[in-house]
């Protein structure tokens, strides 16, 4: 903690407290989140759980995942230093929008915004799933945002699990409203459980209410195992309703995986737009890699928003001209998104590039 100054508590968890801190030794006084965990009296199982979280944070470095910066041990406390997301949680954004809706203004998020958020989460999950990691607690509270509310970052890997290539987990864990049927029924589960949770998040973004809610846990579980939720409103297009329906299939073999969704015509235009912009996101502070030449060339050859024209199976797809583009397979994620520009390159290009990121 010698390099950081505490500002305020921003969260409390099962093992510790999360502090917003600022750096002492750099001119910018960079703000970070430091999770302080009291290790005194911990059981071996609890220590392994904490170490697992640190290892996963190191392993999943990605522009759309909260970045790991450092860790330290001091006075029987383990400190995990992570990126700070100024925009707060997606849960707070939904609650604010719900308050507007409840004031009889009937304001929902534009479907384009919802699908952009959805695709960002999908890309981050793809990065995790390719590493055989299941998040296990995907929910709006664990999705953070930048100050402009344009970039989402997955967070809170305290209960994430790394699977073997052919294994499945069986521990019942996660937030009740977003649990998949297989977890509720104590059946083995895998990455498809994250897809169910993603469907719940998508439903909530569209409807501003939880897909599965009830007065008590048994009532919630019963709704989940039967996939019984209120129908989406008329403000949601049929294509997006079908997307939610597919994600909330009770049988995992009927539920799409990440790679299937990344090639879906409904998602593809947003995927291309995000691919064009992610090279402009600052990489995590620990990422010392040099900018990728292939990344720069891809950013130059992809169209910009000013040169795009409408494309869609759905009227809600963003403006995109795809006739000369080859759809990108999902496996390019790990290579394409792992690269970033250096600070000098970003400074030089900032005046020339107008990006939501």
From Swiss-Prot:
One Pfam short name: Pkinase
PROSITE patterns xref list: PROTEIN_KINASE_ATP (PS00107), PROTEIN_KINASE_DOM (PS50011), PROTEIN_KINASE_ST (PS00108)
GO molecular function: ATP binding; metal ion binding; protein serine kinase activity; protein serine/threonine kinase activity
Tissue: Expressed in hypodermal cells including in hyp7 syncytium but not in seam cells.
Required cofactor names: Mg(2+)
Biological-process GO terms, alphabetical: molting cycle; positive regulation of endocytosis
Region called Disordered, residue ranges: 281-357
Binding site for ATP: 10-18, 35
Mutant lacking the gene: phenotype: Failure to shed the cuticle at the end of the first molt resulting in an arrest at the L1 to L2 transition stage. RNAi-mediated knockdown results in a less severe phenotype characterized by a failure to shed the cuticle only in the middle part of the body at the end of the first molt. In hyp7 syncytium, RNAi-mediated knockdown results in the apical membrane accumulation of lrp-1 and mislocalization of several components of the endocytic machinery.
UniProtKB keywords: ATP-binding, Cytoplasm, Developmental protein, Kinase, Magnesium, Metal-binding, Nucleotide-binding, Serine/threonine-protein kinase, Transferase
A Gene Ontology cellular-component term: cytoplasm
Catalytic reaction annotation: L-seryl-[protein] + ATP = O-phospho-L-seryl-[protein] + ADP + H(+); L-threonyl-[protein] + ATP = O-phospho-L-threonyl-[protein] + ADP + H(+)
Entry-linked PANTHER family: CAMK FAMILY PROTEIN KINASE, SERINE_THREONINE-PROTEIN KINASE NEK1
Name the record gives this protein: Serine/threonine-protein kinase nekl-2
Species of the source: Caenorhabditis elegans
